[in-house]
Design a protein with these regions (language model features):
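N-terminal catalytic or cofactor-binding beta/alpha core of small enzyme domains
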Residues: 1-261
Length: 261
């Protein structure tokens, strides 16, 4: 098993938002990380008194995802919107009506508990992303949004057969093209890696990218979810640094090829 990352501390939303669009003024990049930490805000700690094992597991957060997101944002000169509050409080990658928006540790009654969580943690995060995307499109730019995640190597007793997954909507040509270029570039740089399309989840599944697709045309918004196998997450290890470098360099290469197309 990889060395487990320490819990991420800090505000529930960490955002750096330069008004930058990388090297192509026609394109605006946005990087997000919905499951970057397992922090429990003080007012809700009593609810999680017996949930430490879940908080420290893949259920609590996505180990490594925030590290990758920060590096992606620096490389793209892009705004980063990232959450360090545990997904067990509220899952920022779920639509508002999703039945698993809250975990079993958040009681449904009285209703003001969940309403307060959504008001303090869910809505500000989602609005921040929505505002960044809408503002860029309003300026006539095409938005490329990369949402950084990681996945547990074994789920429900089944071994996940991939090192990296690139998730997209097959019905949106821009996402298909960029994903294909990214995957090809990554496999060329790191042929030992198994890189899969729409795995371990489908790109059309309920999530932040899927939500944004509903509100923006395919010509204006490209939403890609990056999924990295958590078995590679090993802080301080050369292999983990090399994987991150390959992911970022291959995306840069894919974007350059797209610009020339």
């Amino acid at each position: 098993m990889p060395a487990r990352q320490p819990p991420v501390r800090g505000d529930h939303v960490a955002s750096t938002a330069p008004d930058a669009t990388g090297c192509d003024a026609r394109v605006a990049f946005v990087v997000s990380c919905e499951h970057g930490g397992n922090r429990v805000p003080p007012r809700y700690r009593e609810l999680f008194a017996r949930a430490q094992a879940a908080l420290d597991s893949h259920r609590g957060y996505d180990p490594g995802a925030l590290t990758v997101a920060r590096q992606l944002a620096r490389a793209l000169v892009a705004p980063l919107v990232a959450a360090t509050t545990t997904r067990l409080l509220v899952d920022l990658n779920r639509s508002p009506s999703h039945r698993k928006l809250h975990s079993e540790w958040i009681p449904a009654s009285p209703p003001d508990i969940r309403a307060g969580i959504r008001a303090r943690h869910y809505l500000p995060y989602r609005r921040r992303i929505e505002d960044l995307v809408a503002a860029s499109i309003g300026r006539g730019q095409r938005v490329v949004h990369v949402s950084s995640h990681s996945f547990t190597p074994v789920f429900d007793g089944v071994v996940r057969n991939a090192d990296v997954g690139i998730l997209y909507d097959p019905g949106r040509p821009g996402e298909v093209a960029l994903s294909a270029r990214w995957i090809a570039a990554l496999q060329a740089r790191a042929p030992h890696l198994k890189v899969r399309r729409n795995y371990p989840y489908t790109g059309k599944s309920d999530g932040l990218c899927a939500w944004l697709r509903r509100h923006h045309a395919a010509a204006d918004y490209v939403g890609i979810e990056l999924e990295v196998n958590q078995r590679h997450v090993a802080p301080g290890r050369a292999e983990w640094r090399a994987l991150r470098a390959a992911i970022i360099a291959s995306l840069a290469e894919a974007l350059e090829l797209e610009k020339r197309a």
